[in-house]
Amino acid sequence: MQKTNKFLKIGTKEFKSRLLVGTGKYSSLEVMQKSLINTKCEIVTVAVRRVQGLEHGHKGLMESIDWKRIWMLPNTAGCSNAEEAIRIAKLGRELAKLAGQENNNFVKLEVIPDKKYLLPDPIGTLKAAEQLVKEGFTVLPYINSDPLIAKQLEEIGCATVMPLGSPIGSAQGIRNAANIAMIIAESRIPIIIDAGIGVPSEAAQALEMGADGVLINSAIALAENPILMAQAFSKATEAGRDGYLSGRLKENPLASPSSPLEGVISNN
């Protein structure tokens, strides 16, 4: 965990913003573009399969983002096993090259056989991550909030781990804060909370806990005003990080007056 680092460092890259943003579910490319600007993000994740298949909402996506300013994070969304994820990761690397990022080996690794709750497969994720690390990828795996899996992925060479706050798109917030706190405490790599965050205050909570960043998509894209919500998440992420660095007031079972009692005028 990068406790007091000024920048978010993933692999050999450093980023000022700790807010990563997804590109799906926006009502239009124009709304997405304006939202991305308001987030001040420097990393944007792109679903390789959907972009290549030109699915609804993804046609023209690659051309609508300034890849000289934004670092692409290809993801393996839609992959249900390790082999499929490895293949899509390689396509993602080529996609980044087409965008002019020749040295981009980043991949957001998702192995999700469960179509109902979209929970990641830990065994498939470990298998794919191990192979991708060997092939020179900077691997950012999406995982359940399991400290043991997180540590195993760190030990095989992943650049971060990305535990879910709650299921993808559920807007349930950070449901397993205790486990995530364990992951943060035991990790020597950055921790990015991914999935389930629904409002800016939950992003602030994640950073206050000591997470190094958050990845947000649905909460911005599906808001009534995505462009304004993007700005709110940007501010919340910065506030949460500042709050963490400031050192919070310790909880106390007793009250503590904010004004000193010495010198108080008595009734006598």
Curated annotation (Swiss-Prot):
Alphabetic keyword roster: Cytoplasm, Schiff base, Thiamine biosynthesis, Transferase
One Gene Ontology term from the biological process aspect of the record: thiamine diphosphate biosynthetic process
Pathway: Cofactor biosynthesis; thiamine diphosphate biosynthesis
Swiss-Prot/TrEMBL catalytic activity: [ThiS sulfur-carrier protein]-C-terminal-Gly-aminoethanethioate + 2-iminoacetate + 1-deoxy-D-xylulose 5-phosphate = [ThiS sulfur-carrier protein]-C-terminal Gly-Gly + 2-[(2R,5Z)-2-carboxy-4-methylthiazol-5(2H)-ylidene]ethyl phosphate + 2 H2O + H(+)
GO cellular component entries: cytoplasm
InterPro entries in alphabetical order: Aldolase_TIM (IPR013785), Thiazole_synthase_ThiG (IPR033983), ThiG (IPR008867)
Positions of the catalytic residues: 108 (schiff-base intermediate with dxp)
UniProt-annotated binding residues for 1-deoxy-D-xylulose 5-phosphate: 169, 195-196, 217-218
Disordered as annotated region, ranges: 248-268
EC id: 2.8.1.10
Localization terms from the record: Cytoplasm
Polar residues compositional bias, start-end: 255-268
Listed GO MF terms: thiazole synthase activity
Protein role: Catalyzes the rearrangement of 1-deoxy-D-xylulose 5-phosphate (DXP) to produce the thiazole phosphate moiety of thiamine. Sulfur is provided by the thiocarboxylate moiety of the carrier protein ThiS. In vitro, sulfur can be provided by H(2)S.
Family: Belongs to the ThiG family.
HAMAP family: ThiG
Record text on subunit structure and interactions: Homotetramer. Forms heterodimers with either ThiH or ThiS.
PANTHER family on file: THIAZOLE SYNTHASE
Record protein name field: Thiazole synthase
Protein's organism: Prochlorococcus marinus (strain NATL1A)
Species classification: Bacteria, Bacillati, Cyanobacteriota, Cyanophyceae, Synechococcales
Gene this chain is encoded by: thiG
